[in-house]
Amino acid sequence: MEIQFAYGSNMDPSQLNNKKIKMRNPRVAKLERYQFAFTKKSNWDSKLSQASRINGKANISENNDSMVWGILLDLTESEVEKMDDSEGTGSGHYFRKPVEVITDSGIVKAITYVAHDDKLIPNTTPLEWYLNHVLDGAKYHKLPEDYIESIQALGQ
């Protein structure tokens, strides 16, 4: 099993189900000194008729004054491969990064996904359907309300 720190739409049970990933032992975790934003260029833009502008997907970046809330997932080797495919690790969209997160039980080492620099775009917002997946996951796992509100604000 591999422990992954999931954030953004990867917290949404329906998204995980679509990827054929079981939500084993999910637990809330906090990644300090990182910031959440919709700064990863969406690879859906060319496929969606409603995309009249470039839209952002979830990403995290180092920032000493911020923190990112998410969940830890215990993934099998085949689920890790599915997640890697979904996140585009083989095509240069995201890369896997080791991190240490804080849980109620203490510090846990995990892997998360971070967008490659050449896939970043500033000052963008997500498509509404994507934002809803992010918010649904955050609410499902009962992340702090002020954090959920900050995600909502980023999406507008």
Language model regions located:
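Glycine-aromatic micro-motifs
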Residues: M1-Q156
